[in-house]
Amino acid sequence: IIPDIVFYVPNTFTPDDDEHNQTWRFYVEGIDEMGFHLTVYNRWGETVWESFDPAGEWDGMYGGKLVQPGVYTWTAWYKERDSDGKKVRQGFINVLR
């Protein structure tokens, strides 16, 4: 039996110090965690955050400051647990304040 790969990726977060929804996290189960890489880009294609840990959380910071409100894109590369198959997923994040 090959386990399903399950994703949940919130598309909005609000890093505004109100104690709610302060970080953005990519939730995934059923992958080979050693083959994981997640990158968040601004509208100019610059990398503003990346993680090799599926449980990593982005706090909305880039270069020591909170990013501007807006739409950011993400790309996740991951490996299936029971094969060498590599996959890519992409999406967007709305940063609100």
Predicted segments with their positions:
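Short loop/turn motifs at secondary-structure boundaries
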Residues: 1-97
